[in-house]
């Protein structure tokens, strides 16, 4: 407004000078008006004073900044799951590597085995076949690590059977441990069907240290000597064994119809990929909504 007033004052002064210089124009007001109209520069009606109300309206309210925590937090959780995934995959690789290391002797204190899962150990003793148990049903894991699969009408070749768990009396001590001797088909679950595999003499074997399993959800109770999962406490109570569970490794010289060893699979829950996809998706969606609603103020 001040700039506009200065422009008008200069124009009026110019016109007064024109009248004095040209007395004839004093008696012709239209001529003066026409000259003022022709010579006056275009007026800029915009003001230089900022519109404070409009600027305040464009500011993000504290609630808007608070809502930004949602996409930021979910993004952070996604990054955390990426780190967890890398850690879990490396842990699985390390455990698989332990399966190929040289076996060690069974420690004097069997409680030390709790920190030795997937380690190879050597044991010597004899099997107590009269207390044999079954674990399953399970699919056969071949020596190359591939688990056999089959359909409903091909059970004969599907690898569907049971793991034979037998108490093992150690030769150099009074302790009894549980040994998963390996897999047998449904046709060989009864000991009478595999007499060559029921060794009575003292043997030496290599096995993998395992832990017990928690009861899976919706799993029914065990029936007799048939167990659905590695219920270590109940197995030990039924056989008088120490809480030690070992998986016998694969032996290419296994007798015909004897349990097939090497039924160990490194099983660690690794759902971090699905978790990180979920968190990053939530972060992207909430970031878009926050920008649309808080920054651009676009209604739905």
From Swiss-Prot:
Disruption phenotype: Lethal at larval stage. Larvae show reduced locomotor speed and response to light. Results in smaller muscle fibers with mitochondria defects. RNAi-mediated knockdown is lethal at larval stage. RNAi-mediated knockdown in the developing CNS, in the eye and antenna disk from early larval stages shows increased lifespan with reduction of COX activity, increased succinate dehydrogenase (SDH) activity, reduced locomotor speed and response to light. It holds the Pfam family SURF1. The lineage of its organism: Eukaryota, Metazoa, Ecdysozoa, Arthropoda, Hexapoda. It is found in: Mitochondrion inner membrane. Belongs to the SURF1 family. GO terms for cellular component: mitochondrial inner membrane; mitochondrion. Keywords: Membrane, Mitochondrion, Mitochondrion inner membrane, Transmembrane, Transmembrane helix. The keyword Transmembrane applies. Its main location: mitochondrion. Probably involved in the biogenesis of the COX complex. The keyword Repressor does not apply. It comes from the Eukaryota. This is SURF1-like protein. It is a multi-pass membrane protein.
